[in-house]
Amino acid sequence: MFQKQERIGLVVYLYYNRDARKLSKFGDLYYHSKRSRYLIVYINKNDLDTKLEEMRRLKCVKDIRPSAFDDIDRQFVGNLHRDETNNHQKG
């Protein structure tokens, strides 16, 4: 049966857009901004350390930033109520 794998998104900044094809072997290319010269690449979390190390060694890569999606609070129920109580306590 299909098992869901934990994945993480990486924002990879490039020096030149022509080097985007070189990064397709590391994971799934989700988006390529030709104007801002960055890619969004999704890779498996268990391969993160090895693939990140290999990607940083490439001369075409300027910078790599991991996605902050896991750090964001996605519990939306009651967010407005929490904000109202925090504002009343401050003021």
UniProtKB/Swiss-Prot annotation:
The keyword Cytoplasm applies. The keyword Cytoplasm applies. InterPro entries: DUF2129. It is found in: Cytoplasm. Keywords: Cytoplasm. One of its GO terms (cellular component) is cytoplasm. Belongs to the UPF0298 family. This is UPF0298 protein M28_Spy0318. It comes from Streptococcus pyogenes serotype M28 (strain MGAS6180).
